[in-house]
Regions:
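Bacterial N-terminal signal peptides that target proteins for export
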Residues: 1-12
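Bacterial N-terminal signal peptides
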Residues: 10-20
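Sec/Tat signal peptide C-region and signal peptidase I cleavage site
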Residues: 20-26
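Compact, glycine-rich, soluble single-domain proteins
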Residues: 27-174
Length: 174
């Protein structure tokens, strides 16, 4: 029995190494006092008005950091946004000054909260592949990453950059 278990674990490890495990799709980058956990975007066809991206960022450094922006190959640069309404997915406000990350803290960009709103998609972002991109920080500068492209979730918000900014401006004038 122990030999069978060892063989099974070895096979599981080999399959995981080849990408046969959903958990193995998660990836991270450690650099300049930051740990970037599983940056990802929703799949989008070329010509789409935009797509959204998410990541979890842990500041392991001793100084505060600030996320300022992002880029992805295949779409216009991102705008940092936060949701302002739990019932209206298009009610977003632009975070013009970025998002602070205190030393030892973790920033979670996730659907329905804060995220990256990429503009016009000029190259198909197909599901289950990676796209080159960057995250831009105040102290760490430009950090090269790969965004994993995931299917659009039926629960996830569908955004248009113009609609998001209009909603933000409308809420600011009330």
């Amino acid at each position: 029995m122990p030999v069978t278990l060892i063989k099974a674990l070895g096979l599981a490890g080999a399959l995981a190494g080849l990408g046969f495990c959903a958990v193995c799709q998660a990836h991270e980058v450690k650099t300049r006092g930051l740990v970037l956990h599983h940056p990802w975007v929703h799949a989008a066809a070329a010509g789409a008005m935009g797509t959204d991206g998410f990541v979890m960022i842990t500041n392991t450094g001793k100084a505060p950091e600030r996320l300022l922006g992002a880029t992805i190959e295949g779409a216009v640069d991102a705008t940092l946004v936060r949701a302002v309404s739990p019932v209206d997915a298009n009610a977003l406000c632009q975070l013009e000054n970025g998002i602070d990350i205190a030393p030892g803290a973790t920033l979670v960009l996730k659907p329905g909260a804060s995220g990256l709103l990429f503009g016009a998609v000029n190259k198909s972002l197909r599901e289950d592949i990676y796209a080159n991109g960057t995250l831009v920080f105040a102290r760490a500068g430009v950090v090269k990453i790969e965004f994993y492209i995931q299917a659009e979730d039926s629960k996830a918000a569908k955004h248009s950059p113009a609609g998001a900014m209009a909603a933000c401006l409308a809420s600011a004038t009330q």
